[in-house]
Amino acid sequence: MTKLENPVLMATIGGAQGLRGEVRAKAYTADPTALGDYGLLHSTDGRSFEILEIREMKNVVVVRFRGINDRNAAEALNGLELYIERDNLPDEELEDDEFYYADLEGLEALDDKGVSYGTVTGVFDFGAGDLLELKGPGKRPVLIPFSEASVLEIDLEAGTLLIDPLAAGLVDDPELSQFTAGKPKKKK
């Protein structure tokens, strides 16, 4: 049984596929078939899973794990989330402007004046662009676009995001934000 220090969600198991113990899984990796390249996958209940075979099928991957040899065993895994340790992700493959979702969670969102808008509690991709979920103490969560206009700077070492609250949709009054999303300010 393994307890991960800094778990990163890599896949969610769906239904069984066929009779040999294969399962359909939704992989949260850029290359779904690379799921096996990260080593053992772990569930929150402490079990470890070794991938023996993996192939793509439509919007999912079909996976066969060591020790899962029939349909009944595969069906018992339905809905199981599989994780790896954050240290198993290759940092050297990231560009300067690329980040793992797991690294963004927990960062504090600040504007240029140091005002906090909460911490990142989730990162979502609904197809039209990534969204960051911010949650402040005593506040409801809000979603902001994870774009160059909204998120101006990311400092992983300091644990902060510099945001433009106007571009992020957190304020309505341009006077509350020094940034105007590239629009020139009117002279009086």
Curated annotation (Swiss-Prot):
Example GO biological process term? rRNA processing
Q: In this protein, which residues make up the domain named PRC barrel?
A: 96-169
InterPro entries per UniProt: PRC-brl_dom, PRC_barrel-like_sf, RimM, RimM_N, RimM_N_sf, Transl_B-barrel_sf
Q: Where in the cell is it found?
A: Cytoplasm
Q: What is its main location?
A: cytoplasm
Q: Does the keyword Cytoplasm apply?
A: yes
Could you name the Gene Ontology cellular component terms for this entry? cytoplasm; ribosome
Keyword tags: Chaperone, Cytoplasm, Ribosome biogenesis, rRNA processing
One GO molecular-function entry: ribosome binding
Task: Give a Pfam family name.
Answer: RimM
User: Record keywords: rRNA processing included?
Assistant: yes
Task: Please give the function described in this protein's UniProt entry.
Answer: An accessory protein needed during the final step in the assembly of 30S ribosomal subunit, possibly for assembly of the head region. Essential for efficient processing of 16S rRNA. May be needed both before and after RbfA during the maturation of 16S rRNA. It has affinity for free ribosomal 30S subunits but not for 70S ribosomes.
What family does this chain come from, according to its entry?
Belongs to the RimM family.
Subunit info here reads:
Binds ribosomal protein uS19.
Description of its domains: The PRC barrel domain binds ribosomal protein uS19.
HAMAP family from the UniProt entry: Ribosome_mat_RimM (MF_00014)
The entry's protein name is Ribosome maturation factor RimM
